[in-house]
A protein has these predicted regions:
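Gly/Pro-rich hinge or "lid" segments in bacterial periplasmic/extracellular proteins
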Residues: 159-212, 216, 226, 336, ...
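Structural transition elements
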Residues: 312-345, 361-368
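Aromatic- and charge-enriched surface segment that lines or borders ligand/interaction sites
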Residues: 79-123, 138, 144-146, 231, ...
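Extracytoplasmic/peripheral linker and loop segments enriched in polar/acidic and small residues
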Residues: 23, 81, 383-402, 425-501, ...
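N-terminal lobe/hinge region of extracytoplasmic solute-binding protein
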Residues: 35-85, 116, 184-185
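Ligand/substrate-recognition segments at binding pockets and active sites
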Residues: 345-415, 495
Length: 529
């Protein structure tokens, strides 16, 4: 069985790990961080993968970060923003002691240059949406944003690393084009070497804040999970990021950490895994069929068999730590009701609904999810429905998603800032909808092409109120989306990392990024304790 196969593999991995041991003394004080996947661009106006954003968080700075209580902590800003009574003018005082990596002074003109560039050429329209109307320089170190409308999520937006400032001098020839292979920002590290598989970071001596606790970082990408796992086991790397490895190896590392053989760190659960259904073409244009497919998934079984429970079942699009995320409106596994809906649409009793399910072939958890779900459908609904699996490399999936190429596809999403807006808008916003079909907008780009009457108004309303009224609107949005059944949330993932005992346990910020500047080696005496 699938469970037996996974368990056997995990046992072999655990044995190999135990026999080889975790600790190899390092002769360098530099720290090596390993992950999978390549970085094709460093341009904040284009970067969207977790891997790339993690790097940006080390070489760039946001205007603000979030404290543990959710309040804003000024970073490049000098203090909290001032917002006008109508909510449409936002004034941001900036620090006066910041320089870019090329020595250029950071000021309001530089920040305005970067924001205007992002608004002009950025491919990540969901980050800002239609909120910012104009960017103005009010004083040498005072920036003013004119908004099209009041925005409750603006504070979260101002923490986005995608809006990190760039040196106007370094990007003078790239005001209207992307710069993929270099980055000149204000962060605690400067980039001294870049290719898709390796990046070398050196501490920035003129950094305005606390200096890094290490003399430099080497970020490397290895080709597969086994290579990454082996590199940590042999001591070739100091830190390993969890998104890079197979579930059985992740489980093995989790068990090793419990025994004290290495450090494990867990960040905030902000990444959602979900399935998108193509809603604008037959047969899945039939809402009852989409609802039946949603009812056929047993999340609890998937969580346990695929991830040993490390990925928690999720029945919402909004992570539970955010406003409106404390509910679970999506229905639980119910094959009996699924069969009723399938029969109403003419299936069962000799007629099967064939659903092509695409998984990203280079994402290990995707294939295990697909196989587990396929087995569930075969067990519960064999006479009514069958899943046909197809593995496609992730870059191809992302490129073809907005073309309507996939009837059903497994994806994941990490909001660019911790606010419900950063999860709902990228999946649901639509600039041109006809009934329940989105012709143009993020819902089309995300591959569902689904909308609903009243949904776009509700999305805007949710970003104009706070507290209980906002939660009520967010709940309405989720209810509409549940009924439409174009998205099926599957699980919630916390970022994890493992480090040698020679490195202090890694820490995460509230946005889910590893604090790379906090990585620090410990003395041999501390290591032995």
């Amino acid at each position: 069985t699938l469970r037996t196969s996974i368990s056997l593999t995990a046992a072999l991995v655990m044995a190999a790990f135990t026999q080889s041991g975790c600790q190899v003394s390092s002769t360098s004080q530099r720290i090596t961080v390993a992950s999978a996947g390549s970085i094709s661009s460093l341009d904040p106006a284009q970067v969207s993968t977790v891997h790339s954003l993690q790097l940006l968080s080390a070489i760039g700075d946001p205007l603000y970060s979030l404290n543990k209580d959710g309040s804003l902590q000024p970073r490049l800003a000098a203090s909290e923003p001032t917002i006008s009574a109508d909510g449409r003018l936002v004034t941001i005082p900036l620090r006066t002691d910041v320089r870019f990596h090329d020595g250029t002074r950071f000021d309001a003109k530089a920040m305005a240059f970067s924001l205007r560039r992002f608004l002009r050429i950025g491919t990540l329209s969901y980050v800002v949406g239609d909120r910012i109307k104009a960017v103005e320089v009010e004083a040498p170190h005072v920036l003013r944003l004119e908004l099209n409308r009041r925005s409750t999520s603006l504070e979260g937006l101002l923490t986005s690393i995608n809006l990190t400032p760039l040196s106007p001098r370094a990007y003078a020839k790239h005001k209207d084009s992307f710069l993929h292979d270099n980055f000149v920002g204000t962060g605690p590290y400067r980039l001294t070497k870049f290719n898709e598989k390796q990046q070398r970071l050196e501490p920035f001596e003129q950094y305005w804040g606390d200096p890094p606790k290490n003399p430099g970082l080497d970020l490397i990408s290895l080709s597969n999970s086994t290579a990454l796992f082996g590199a940590l086991r042999s001591g070739e790397v100091d830190v390993l990021l969890s998104a890079s490895i197979d579930e059985d190896q992740r489980h093995a590392l989790n068990q090793q950490a419990k025994r004290g053989d290495l450090h494990e760190s867990v960040g905030p659960a902000m990444e959602i895994g979900y399935i998108t259904l193509l809603s604008n073409t037959a047969p899945l244009s039939d809402q009852r069929l989409r609802q039946a497919i949603a009812l056929s998934l047993d999340r609890d079984e998937v969580s346990e068999r695929v991830s040993y429970g490390l990925r928690r079942p999720l029945r919402a699009l909004i992570p539970p730590s955010l406003p409106g995320g404390g509910v679970a409106p999506w229905p639980k596994h119910n094959p009996k009701e699924a069969k009723t809906l399938l029969r109403q649409s003419g299936y069962c009793q000799g007629t099967q609904l064939e659903v092509p399910l695409t998984f990203r072939s280079n994402v290990p958890a995707d294939k295990l999810l697909a196989l587990t779900w396929q087995a569930q459908v075969q067990r519960d609904l064999a006479d009514c429905m069958v899943l046909k699996l197809d593995g496609v490399e992730s870059t191809t999936v992302y490129r073809q998603l907005g073309e309507g190429a996939f009837k059903a596809v497994i994806l994941d999403w990490l909001g660019s800032y911790p606010d419900p807006e950063a999860y709902l808008n990228p999946l649901l916003s639509c600039s041109n909808a006809e009934g329940h079909v989105c012709l143009d907008g993020e819902a089309a780009i995300s591959g569902s092409f689904w909308s609903a009457p009243g949904l776009q108004t509700a999305l805007q309303d949710s970003d104009s109120v706070r507290g209980a009224p906002r939660v009520a609107v967010l709940n309405t949005i989720e209810e509409l989306t549940v009924n439409g059944a174009a998205y099926i949330p599957v699980w919630l993932e916390s970022p994890r990392s493992w480090s040698q005992r020679s490195v202090k346990p890694p820490q995460y910020n509230r946005s889910g990024f590893l604090r790379l500047a906090e990585l620090e080696r410990v003395s041999h005496q501390q290591e032995g304790n």
